[in-house]
UniProtKB/Swiss-Prot annotation:
It is linked to This protein is found in reduced amount in tumor cells of high metastatic potential. Hexamer of two different chains: A and B (A6, A5B, A4B2, A3B3, A2B4, AB5, B6). Interacts with PRUNE1. Component of the SET complex, composed of at least ANP32A, APEX1, HMGB2, NME1, SET and TREX1. Within this complex, interacts directly with SET. Also interacts with TREX1, but only following translocation to the nucleus. Signal peptide: none annotated. HAMAP family: NDP_kinase. It comes from the Eukaryota. GO terms for biological process: cell differentiation; cellular response to fatty acid; cellular response to glucose stimulus; cellular response to xenobiotic stimulus; CTP biosynthetic process; endocytosis; GTP biosynthetic process; hippocampus development. The gene is Nme1. InterPro entries: NDK-like_dom, NDK-like_dom_sf, Nucleoside_diP_kinase, Nucleoside_diP_kinase_AS. Its EC number is 2.7.4.6. One of its GO terms (molecular function) is intermediate filament binding. Its cofactor is Mg(2+). Belongs to the NDK family. This is Nucleoside diphosphate kinase A.
Amino acid sequence: MANSERTFIAIKPDGVQRGLVGEIIKRFEQKGFRLVGLKFIQASEDLLKEHYIDLKDRPFFSGLVKYMHSGPVVAMVWEGLNVVKTGRVMLGETNPADSKPGTIRGDFCIQVGRNIIHGSDSVESAEKEISLWFQPEELVDYKSCAQNWIYE
């Protein structure tokens, strides 16, 4: 599909523990995006430190790494037209208090430190995050039979 891009989405330990994995995947599927990579993992501290390297000088960095290491994470790669931008809209604001109802964080979160989900904020970030969490052979390229009903 022309102009298709990929994004990295991770359901954080609080989202996993609260049983929201299916609901989150359902929202991305119903929107029309295609799941091309999926892992259920206990992320290492080294992986998390690399993932959040841009935040390393922030006072909450060590707490964020500890929290993300506290339980399993669902790491995903989604593909589709404008999936990075649209995915961020679907997630809502980083601070759930600023998120609108109908967004994932607006519907399921209260505090910024437990905002259940991560989504790439740019195509460049998505490429970096995908390569950090997935090997190329772990991404599955296939044609969805629904594609012709979603895209012109």
